[in-house]
Amino acid sequence: VATTRPETLFGDTGVAVNPNDERWKRFIGKNAILPLVGRKLPIVGDEHADPDQGSGAVKITPAHDFNDFEVGLRHKLNLISIFDKEGKINETAPKSYQGLDRLKAREKILEDLEAQGLLEKKEKYEYTIPFGDRSGEILEPFLTDQWFVDAKKLSKEAIKVVKEKKITFFPQSWEKTYFDWLENIQPWCISRQIWWGHKIPIWYGPDKKPFAAMDEKDALNKAEKFYKKKVSLVQDPDVLDTWFSSSLWPFSTLGWPEQTKEFKKYYPTNLLITGFDIIFFWVARMIMMGLFFTKKPPFKEVYIHALIRDEKGQKMSKSKGNVIDPLELTNKYGSDALRFTLSSLASPGRDIKLSTQQVESSRNFSTKIWNASRYILLNCLLYTSDAADE
């Protein structure tokens, strides 16, 4: 088999071959032996294995690769997590590898495979590696316990209200984006390992049993009833996904779950104005949560506006350094020039590619209009120079 990540070898729990690959299909149902460990690996038939890539046989490491995880679920393969939180090889590997940084482990594994005559060849291979937006570090899939929402169940009503025109999109073409995402929705991971956010309202008992509660007092009462005695609890250290918290915004800001006068007056609202890039992040999730908790859609219409991108059509972001500050443009070229630029480029559903040169051209054009207008007014008998200045 070929791999770009030899360091994950100790987490391999299977080998996949394409069931239509004449070279390998006779081996399906048999076992291969994992080098350096001697563990038996079942050979499974799965279309994830591409006969035209490499040897056509793929090592499956369900705990450290997203695609392999899905293959593992389909074939009930074991999950073996081989890294600790520092990216070092843990105790699941042979002792000589334990504690090694994953990249140093890569080198040692290759050396040991070669020493045993098990390394066929090494070659350069170009492929896409995921990097952290802020850290710039290589991202490694890592198996952890997380909280999930059954988004498939919630999506059914959300699809229904748009199909029945209880919620409409403008431009209507964006409904396709909405439907495509909801009809193929996956379980939604709502727990995050970050500093900022709403703490997950889960407390754990001495045996790690979880208790969902409104607050710690409520959790302690539930735990006491369960254990028949008072116990200490520890709250889950994770926080909720920002988009989960945001999905509750239309009604949580109005005093829900209480039937406040604000909730009765302002929920549901009429119109939501937003960009297409968060139709599934926010719009769909607000609709799902609104229908689930209040039995009403949170709004009646969704107006999708364009995104303002840089001159190359890329989305503006701080990490790319391509953000154009509207305040700086206004200070340099004037608010009328910026308004005219955006108005002239805007059309329903189409993004705007903005550059400072466009705003400068609009400023020059606006100056000509201004000067022409002053010239006309100064030459009208009914106007004075003071009126022209105004």
Where are these regions (language model features)?
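Short capping micro-motif at the N-terminus of alpha-helices
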Residues: 1-2, 41-43, 92, 141-142, ...
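NTP-handling and nucleic-acid-processing catalytic cores
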Residues: 1-86, 158-191, 225-229, 252-266
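Short hydrophobic-aromatic micro-motifs
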Residues: 1-3, 8-11, 15-17, 57-60, ...
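Alpha-helical recognition segments enriched in aromatics with Gly/Pro capping
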Residues: 47, 75-87, 194-197, 201-350
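Residue patterns forming the tRNA-binding/recognition surfaces of aminoacyl-tRNA synthetases
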Residues: 53-207, 314, 320-366, 370-371
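Proline-centered turn/helix-capping motifs that create local helix->coil transitions or kinks
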Residues: 121, 294-296, 373-382
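Short, amphipathic alpha-helical segments that act as regulatory/interfacial helices
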Residues: 284-291, 366, 370-377
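Conserved small/polar residues in nucleotide/adenosyl-binding loops
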Residues: 383-388
